[in-house]
UniProtKB/Swiss-Prot annotation:
Its main location: mitochondrion. The gene is TOMM20L. This is TOMM20-like protein 1. GO terms for molecular function: mitochondrion targeting sequence binding. PANTHER family: MITOCHONDRIAL IMPORT RECEPTOR SUBUNIT TOM20 (PTHR12430), TOMM20-LIKE PROTEIN 1 (PTHR12430:SF1).
Amino acid sequence: MPSVRSLLRLLAAAAACGAFAFLGYCIYLNRKRRGDPAFKRRLRDKRRAEPQKAEEQGTQLWDPTKNKKLQELFLQEVRMGELWLSRGEHRMGIQHLGNALLVCEQPRELLKVFKHTLPPKVFEMLLHKIPLICQQFEADMNEQDCLEDDPD
């Protein structure tokens, strides 16, 4: 009957052989890959394509014309919110101020400004309305995406 020590030695030897075989296979594949004449060309092409891809993504993320339109929309929504609040229509004013929060680049800062400028009651109403406005915005965006995807 084999002892536990001999069984452990056998298991350790098998593990060492397996690790050695795996390492050898990795070295073999690396040499085969590096020996491929097209490898350096593909690597060079990939390295050249990375900065171009990054530039393309950067231009897609920041478009000055879109930024200007967002600023105009933001200012319009703030003005409409102030107008409705000055008329005593708190619900309409809060709706427009919430829309301004959606398109604002720094919504936390805008909330701080609203906290200091709006009456406490109106500010509380705005805070309670924010999740609903976000849900409505997401639903509108999903609907718009579905309409853009629909070929009809």
